[in-house]
Amino acid sequence: MKHYQAYLIDLDGTMYKGTDEIDGAAQFIDYLNNNHIPHLYVTNNSTKTPVQVTEKLREMHIDAKPDEVVTSALATADYISEQHPNATVYMIGGHGLKTALTDAGLSIKNDEHVDYVVIGLDEKVTYEKLSIATLAVRNGAKFISTNPDVSIPKERGFLPGNGAITSVVSVSTGIQPEFIGKPEPIIMSKSLDILGLEKSEVAMVGDLYDTDIMSGINVGIDTIHVQTGVSTYEDIQSKEIPPTYSFKDLNVAIAELEK
């Protein structure tokens, strides 16, 4: 296995599974930390702040820091502030998205006359929220969604994800949003910019082919698939572009790196 200078790492299915630890995850991060290898956690979860993400990782005995976390909310806020500083935004989403937008100097408004509509996962979404978003998009607001995931794994099973919520507005208006999170290149490009390395020096680590592995492929970096989450080894063998590597778990990756 190639020794990379840095890694971009998925969370759910790679570092943990729901509220359960994944064997090899904490050990892999310890290996990176002990060898001073930079890494970022890249997540489509827009509901949590980097501090909250770090707290969960630490509960899983993973030694993480907030400045190592790149959420779809952060990538969205940066993208808008670069395009249109001080823009007005109508948002549907959680605390993580609201914090990211306001920290970026964007003004959140509760009406349909805004520069941008941003939709992130909102477990308390209402018809009224969707109505305001729909009217704002019809009025000409730029339409952005933090991530396209149509379902998310929960203890009860697979529940509607942000892509499902976003689809209500896109179907009603006939306008497709610009997606920021994996597998789209915007969140990955931001992560690569933070690392400041050549693409050939960085690998993406994740379990889900359509999201994690494709995010790496879409920006031209190597990919490491771990068989600890959604996509099985058999799943990835049928893909037109397979990942660069596929391991049973991150313990195997460590063993390969230590050869």
From Swiss-Prot:
Q: What EC number(s) does this enzyme carry?
A: 3.1.3.-
Bilayer-spanning residue ranges? none
Please tell me whether the keyword Ligase is annotated for this protein.
no
Its required cofactor(s), as named, are: Mg(2+)
Q: Which Pfam families match?
A: Hydrolase_6, Hydrolase_like
Q: Which InterPro entries match?
A: HAD-like_sf, HAD-SF_hydro_IIA, HAD-SF_hydro_IIA_hyp1, HAD_sf
Q: For this UniProt entry, what's an example GO CC term?
A: cytoplasm
Q: List keywords of the entry alphabetically.
A: Hydrolase, Magnesium, Metal-binding
Q: List the disulfide bonds.
A: none
Query: Which GO-annotated molecular functions does the record name?
Result: metal ion binding; phosphatase activity
Q: Which SUPFAM superfamilies match?
A: HAD-like
The task this protein performs is described as: Catalyzes the dephosphorylation of 2-6 carbon acid sugars in vitro.
Q: Which family does it belong to?
A: Belongs to the HAD-like hydrolase superfamily. NagD family.
Name the chain's protein: Acid sugar phosphatase
The organism is Staphylococcus epidermidis (strain ATCC 12228 / FDA PCI 1200)
